[in-house]
């Protein structure tokens, strides 16, 4: 019994050490993900989104004014798995002449009507690979739902936040504080 307890403690301690290294590796992979950037602020967040996700649209609506003011850099990482049309809609956004505009228009319509408006598109081989790579990175965050934010604190610690973000939480993030998931 005592040995099992010690082994459990060792596994927990070891996984927390690995988790830090894994999170840094995750950040490095995110820097090479396919994303749509808004803003140019000092604080950088990676925001995974699905074109059919209402909560993702709400997160974008909250982040956009702060990004537009230059206080935040949001790297919107498309994934496509919530519904049958998600993957093809994510492909349509990435393959649009202006992906940022396509994403914004889709999110605004989703907020207004509750439905995504971007038409589905058949993914090119490059887009298909990019979306699958983004999905693998998303899975590696440990998340099972959207939105999922990944950010780095001023000291270099990589953290993630799952769920709907409040204005207050976004303010904390911009000021260099971590968030509780």
Place the predicted regions along the sequence by residue.
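Extracytoplasmic thiol/disulfide redox context detector
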Residues: 6-85, 122-145, 163-181
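Short acidic-hydrophobic, aromatic-tinged amphipathic segments that line or gate anion-handling sites
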Residues: 93, 161-162
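Conserved segment of the thioredoxin-like fold in thiol-based oxidoreductases
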Residues: 84-129
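A short, hydrophobic beta-strand/beta-hairpin element that forms part of a small beta-sheet core
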Residues: 145-161
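Positively charged n-region of N-terminal signal peptides that target proteins for export
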Residues: 1-4
């Amino acid at each position: 019994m005592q040995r099992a307890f010690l082994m459990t403690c060792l596994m927990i301690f070891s996984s927390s050490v690995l988790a830090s290294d894994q999170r840094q590796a995750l950040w490095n992979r995110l820097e090479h993900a396919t994303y749509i950037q808004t803003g140019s602020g000092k604080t950088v967040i990676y925001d995974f989104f699905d074109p059919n996700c209402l909560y993702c649209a709400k997160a974008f609506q909250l982040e956009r004014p702060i990004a537009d003011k230059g206080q935040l850099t949001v790297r919107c990482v498309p994934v496509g798995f919530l519904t049958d049309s998600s993957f093809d809609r994510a492909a349509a956004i990435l393959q649009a002449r202006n992906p940022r505009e396509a994403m914004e228009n889709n999110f605004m319509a989703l907020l207004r009507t509750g439905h995504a408006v971007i038409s589905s598109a058949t993914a090119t081989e490059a887009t298909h690979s990019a979306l699958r790579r983004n999905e693998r990175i998303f899975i590696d965050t440990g998340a099972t739902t959207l939105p999922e934010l990944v950010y780095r604190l001023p000291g270099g610690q990589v953290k993630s936040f799952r769920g709907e973000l409040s204005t207050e939480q976004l303010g904390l993030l911009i000021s260099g504080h971590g968030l509780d998931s």
